[in-house]
């Protein structure tokens, strides 16, 4: 296909020359060049044309007239979203395994793209330093803390274990109590890997909660396997994944109460927290007073991986861990989200691509909102059936529970006959 000239005219009457292949849908060209559909009007041979249906033709005169005043071309070149003559040629670095990019705003409002390349050794040091700095700056671990460490055996919780082991001398003295909810959607192989890794860390107090513990916690009539399969088949992946995570957290909270320890640590990384905040903003609720450290009823949730992305965790494990610890199998049917969940991760990843480091702005904005506007903490209750701590932050208008003495999931399970209306008194 021949290349064809497309002219982009900005609000300062500057003309930017782009090229598109004949036969290409213009909507595809716009997406490939990071030109938002609603930022331009399309003129073909001086006539307004629908940019979503037009196909680029060789002899047509195509002009994209920006209706927005921001400097799209300048921004795209700064971020290297456009790789044309206005962008410095990228020099190959065969030693580099990773480039960290952050969009940095100066006091005059102009932004710069800061980026650093890492080889294997410098990358491991960078992740170790980010991990320690993230814990110390937010006081996630204090001297003589006891922390319940929830482990699935997946890549995120394994990376957390390796980071704790490698940097233990740089952190305040603390005691870890490991727990894995086994025989549910977690595979036997994952549980084995979790046990190996926690032994390497030197954690003496580690418990694998069996299926009987799960069924006892939830008061299932027909058992976990039947319940989760029924929910998956009848209500889909969105319901089954949230139910599974609720079951695991209910078991972890029960275990923590039995231990008398109320600091809970999960393997939530940068995107998990960024996505959670993004989703709560779209729903009109707030995640908590802080992304890496938040109050949840009688518990405190600690997320030591908050500064590190999933990609960085994966690379880190590939370097520092044996192969059978760095590999991750496909998620089970019960651990796959639906579109309502996945689109939030997708949008968060896209936003990080066009605004590198945006997630950190979200984290700080959440803390400022709570501090400056003195937002009241949501009301928390404890489910009469499973014992999980839950919030009323969604509001009464979205509360569809038929049975108000239990959490949303247990109310639903009572309705379909998978748990009794009232748990037995021991």
Model-flagged regions — what are they?
Residues 12-14, 30-32, 36, 48-50, ...:
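ATP-dependent adenylation/nucleotidyltransferase module used to activate substrates
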Residues 272-353, 415-416, 423-426:
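Catalytic subdomain that performs nucleotidyl-dependent activation
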Residues 1-18:
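Eukaryote-biased recognition of intrinsically disordered, low-complexity regulatory segments
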Residues 121, 385-388, 409:
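Short, cysteine/histidine-rich loop/knuckle motifs that typically chelate Zn2+
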Residues 13-15, 19, 39, 50-97, ...:
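A broadly conserved sequence feature marking short terminus-proximal activation segments
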Residues 391-392, 412-415:
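Short functional micro-motifs and their immediate structural scaffolds
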Residues 394-404:
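Short linker/helix segments within small regulatory modules
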Residues 108, 116, 380-383, 404-407:
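Residues immediately within or flanking Cys/His clusters that coordinate Zn2+
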């Amino acid at each position: 296909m021949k290349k064809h000239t497309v002219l982009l005219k900005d609000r300062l009457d500057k003309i930017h020359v782009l090229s598109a292949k004949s036969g290409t849908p213009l909507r595809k060209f716009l997406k490939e060049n990071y030109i938002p559909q609603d930022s331009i009007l399309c003129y073909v041979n001086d006539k307004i044309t629908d940019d979503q249906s037009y196909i680029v033709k060789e002899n047509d005169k195509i002009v994209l007239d920006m209706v927005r005043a921001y400097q799209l071309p300048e921004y795209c070149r700064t971020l290297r979203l456009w790789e044309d003559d206005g962008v410095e040629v990228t020099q190959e670095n065969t030693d580099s395994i990773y480039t960290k990019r952050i969009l940095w705003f100066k006091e005059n409002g102009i932004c710069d793209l800061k980026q650093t390349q890492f080889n294997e050794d410098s990358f491991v040091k960078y992740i170790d330093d980010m991990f320690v700095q993230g814990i110390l700056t937010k006081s996630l671990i204090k001297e003589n803390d006891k922390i319940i460490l929830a482990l699935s055996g997946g890549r995120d919780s394994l990376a957390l274990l390796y980071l704790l082991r490698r940097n233990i001398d740089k952190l305040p003295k603390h005691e870890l109590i490991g727990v894995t909810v086994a025989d549910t959607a977690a595979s036997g192989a994952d549980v084995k890997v979790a046990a190996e890794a926690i032994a390497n860390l030197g954690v003496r107090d580690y418990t694998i909660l069996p299926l009987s513990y799960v069924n006892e916690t939830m008061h299932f009539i027909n058992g976990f396997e039947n319940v989760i399969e029924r929910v998956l088949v009848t209500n889909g992946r969105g319901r089954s994944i949230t139910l599974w995570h609720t079951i695991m957290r209910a078991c972890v909270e029960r275990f923590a109460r039995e231990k008398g320890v109320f600091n809970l640590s999960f393997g939530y990384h940068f995107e998990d927290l960024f996505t959670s905040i993004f989703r709560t903003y779209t729903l009109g609720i707030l995640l908590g007073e802080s992304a890496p450290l938040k109050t949840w009823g009688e518990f405190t949730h600690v997320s030591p991986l908050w500064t590190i992305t999933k990609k960085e965790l994966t690379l880190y494990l590939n370097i520092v861990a044996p192969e059978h610890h760095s590999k991750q199998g496909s998620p089970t049917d019960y651990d796959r989200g639906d579109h309502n969940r996945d689109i939030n991760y997708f949008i968060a990843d896209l936003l990080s691509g066009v605004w590198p480091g945006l997630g950190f702005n979200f984290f700080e904005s959440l803390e400022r909102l709570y501090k400056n506007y003195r937002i009241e903490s949501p009301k928390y209750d404890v489910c009469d059936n499973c014992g999980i701590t839950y919030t009323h932050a969604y509001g009464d208008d979205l509360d569809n529970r038929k049975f108000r003495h239990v959490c949303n999931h247990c109310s639903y399970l009572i309705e379909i006959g998978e748990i009794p209306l009232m748990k037995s008194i021991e």
